[in-house]
Structures are given as C-alpha cells and as structure tokens.
Amino acid sequence: MAILVSLLFLAIALTFFLLKLNEKREKKPNLPPSPPNLPIIGNLHQLGNLPHRSLRSLANELGPLILLHLGHIPTLIVSTAEIAEEILKTHDLIFASRPSTTAARRIFYDCTDVAFSPYGEYWRQVRKICVLELLSIKRVNSYRSIREEEVGLMMERISQSCSTGEAVNLSELLLLLSSGTITRVAFGKKYEGEEERKNKFADLATELTTLMGAFFVGDYFPSFAWVDVLTGMDARLKRNHGELDAFVDHVIDDHLLSRKANGSDGVEQKDLVDVLLHLQKDSSLGVHLNRNNLKAVILDMFSGGTDTTAVTLEWAMAELIKHPDVMEKAQQEVRRVVGKKAKVEEEDLHQLHYLKLIIKETLRLHPVAPLLVPRESTRDVVIRGYHIPAKTRVFINAWAIGRDPKSWENAEEFLPERFVNNSVDFKGQDFQLIPFGAGRRGCPGIAFGISSVEISLANLLYWFNWELPGDLTKEDLDMSEAVGITVHMKFPLQLVAKRHLS
C-alpha cells in the first residue's frame, strides 16, 4: 500500500512538473534566430572591422532576420528588402525612434537634431522645418550657383595638375568640394585659405563621422561607461564637440551681428542659419528652438551634407576606373549634351540619363551608411512570427539588401544598364534600394545630396579623361573599404587627369 501511495505521489509530482515545464516553454517568446554568444560580450566579437559584411555572412547562415546580443543591447539585423519593408513601412511607427548613443548625445546636444532625436513631437516639428524650409526643392534650387562655383574651383585645381602629369588625390579634393559647398549653403561663407578651410571643415566633419561610428563601451555596457574615460575616447569626443560647438557659436554670432547691423528681421534669408534664426522667432511653430537646438540642426546639415557627396563621388569614380567602357559611354553622353560650353550646368542634367544610372548603381553597391542610422522599437511587435521586444535596436543592412541576388541579377557586378527601363529608385519607395533609408526616418536631404553629386560627376567626366598613375591597371585599384558609420575607400583615390578641352 505504501508503495502504491508513493508511486501515486511521484506520478502526480511528475505530472505537475511537466505541466509547469510546458507552461514555461509556452510563455517563452519566439525570438529570431541568434548565433552562439559569449558571456558578457554576447555577439560583439562577431561584428568585425566591417560590420555590414560580417552581418551579411551571419544572415547567410541564420536567415534574413537575426537577433544579436551586443553586450547588454538586444539588436535586430535585417538583411532583405521584404523584411525591411515590414520594419520601415508596415510597422514604421513602432520603429520610428532612435537609440541614444554616447556620441550622438554629446555631439548633437542630447540628441536634439533631426537624425538622432527620439520619436516624438519635438522630432516631428524639427523635421517639418527641415523638409519645408531647409531642404525643399525650391531651397535646394536656390543654391545652384554655389554648387556650380564650388565645382568650378575643383575643376581649376585638377587642371593645374594636368600640365605636370602628376596624380591628384581625388578623395581629398572631393571632401574639399563637399565641405566647401555645405559650408557656404549652411553658413553663408567659408575661409579663404585652402589649408585653413580643409582643417576647419573637412577635418572636423571627418572626425565627427568617425566618432559617430566608433566603439564606446558605455553604449553596450552602461555600468562601465567610465571605461571610455580610461581609453581616451571620452576626451576625444569632448575635444571634437568643443571645436564644433565653438565654431557653430561663432557662425551664429556672426549672423546675429550682421542682422543687427543691417536691420534685417530675417525676411531676406541667405543661408540655412538665416532661415533657422528667422524661424526661431516664429511663434506659430509647434516647438521652441533654443540656441543648442539650432546648433544641433546645423551640425546635422554640416555632417550629413559633407559625407553624402564625397563618399558617393569617390566610389563612382573608382567604379568608372574599374569599368572604362562605362566611363567612355558616360563621357560621350555628357560631351554630346553639353557641346563646346566651358562647363556642365544644372539645366543640362535632365538630359544625362546614363549618368543618373551610374549614380543609382553606385548607391546600390556603395550606400554611404551601409547599416543606415539605427532605429529602436517603442513597443513589442511580431515580425515574421518572431517576437520583437520593446527597446530592441534595429540595423537595416542596406549594403546587403543592395547586393541580394534574390533582388538583383549579377548582384556583385557594376552594371548601370540594369536600371534601363527599370523604375526602381532610391527615394524610399523601393525597398531593394534604400541607401537613404525609408519611412518616417528616411533622409530628408536626398534632393540636396543628389544635386551635388550629379553636377560634380558630370563636370569631372566632361572636362577630363582619367587613368591610374604609372603602370597601374584597373586590376590594381584597391576597392577596400574604410571602417566607419559612413564608408569611404580605405586608400585615397589617386588618379591622373588629362584635359579634354583646351
């Protein structure tokens, strides 16, 4: 009898245990697949020097939607157009916020800019200002003369090298071009000396973007943020922010003095700072802009505008050197359309159909920010049957999506002709090509960036024939990528220019 009672008790206990175990399993959320992770650091060691490439390799093993544990931060990686559309369109509102990072908080005044501000009323109002006042088509067109003048200066610098046959550092010249253009558009003027201008603007922009993509321990292990002080990263960030802050303060003070001296109330708006100062007094705005808010938005324009043009042009010229038949076809088009004029002007651009295909193909293979700007979920959501918790960081691998063989035939090849009779564009409606993102947090400065790229590339191809220095061939050109949130070529693009027009 005792044995039967004991067996009955064991049976009841085992049944209870199994029910509890099953209940626990049922309650466990169905998370996306994850690679094995290490204690404490999680999957950080699997990012590598070029995360967009490492993450594509992981996606090839585990699938297009994977969950990583980067230190203490759950991070979703999206690698196909279909899932990107779910994130950026179907559930855009849930994923419309941004994670707060060490660099963004410091550089952009506690994330009060447009790019890194959390989703909310402040962001909506400031983005509205940017879209309607700072980056509208009308405003972009009003800066045509600045773009043409800055491109003309670059052509003159390149022409000086033609007489000696020396190679030019095209990467450096393109950075000077983009920083000079954005400085005049945003601030109304630039320094006269080339070296001073380079040091003050191009170098500051380069360091800013480097820091935005740098590793800060506190971003992944909040309790250990003090380690960034020991490594020197905190001091480096403070130094860059201090220089940027002093520079933008000087720019704003200059504008205020000029307005006071001229008795201007802001009606005559010459540059982006003028527009912002005028809007600061507009009581109809849904948000008050203090001085730090102005500086955050100004730095957004400064950093974003500089990189988009320089990086895209650098990769476009490198691909054309690699594909001389494509370059020749583009040169023939530009020279036929422009004729014997001294330069390409913006009214010529609408006829340069092949050049536009080259730019589109360049952005497919070389998006400026391969992982875009990270997003963050504001509440729990289900994607493809997987539970995604609130406060999950999200990276969209635009680089991998642009090279997905399911979306693109011969995906790794540079073939501008793929876009002939193909309506796919990069403006955020076609998710197989999203170099500027999509949805609410898509880049509002596409028109400004592309207008600068088109006029610059057209003039480079119109004025000059290009080749590698010495006995180098196209096979010798190193297409390696540099490390950063925006991806330049690892080694500066050195080319020999030969004047086409005498």
Swiss-Prot record:
Induction: By ethylene.
Record GO cellular component, one term: endoplasmic reticulum membrane
Compartments where found: Microsome membrane; Endoplasmic reticulum membrane
Entries under CDD domains matching the protein: CYP71-like
Membrane topology type: Single-pass membrane protein
Tissue: Mesocarp.
GO BP: any one term: fruit ripening
Positions contributing to heme binding: C443
Highest rank taxon of the organism: Eukaryota
Main location: membrane
A Pfam family this chain is assigned to: p450
Cofactor: heme
Key words of the record: Endoplasmic reticulum, Fruit ripening, Heme, Iron, Membrane, Metal-binding, Microsome, Monooxygenase, Oxidoreductase, Transmembrane, Transmembrane helix
InterPro entries registered for this protein in UniProt: Cyt_P450 (IPR001128), Cyt_P450_CS (IPR017972), Cyt_P450_E_grp-I (IPR002401), Cyt_P450_sf (IPR036396)
Transmembrane segments: 7-21
EC number: 1.14.-.-
Keyword Endoplasmic reticulum: yes
Molecular function terms from GO: heme binding; iron ion binding; monooxygenase activity; oxidoreductase activity, acting on paired donors, with incorporation or reduction of molecular oxygen
Intrachain disulfide bonds: none
Known role: Involved in the metabolism of compounds associated with the development of flavor in the ripening fruit process, possibly by acting as trans-cinnamic acid 4-hydrolase.
Recorded family membership: Belongs to the cytochrome P450 family.
Name of the featured protein: Cytochrome P450 71A1
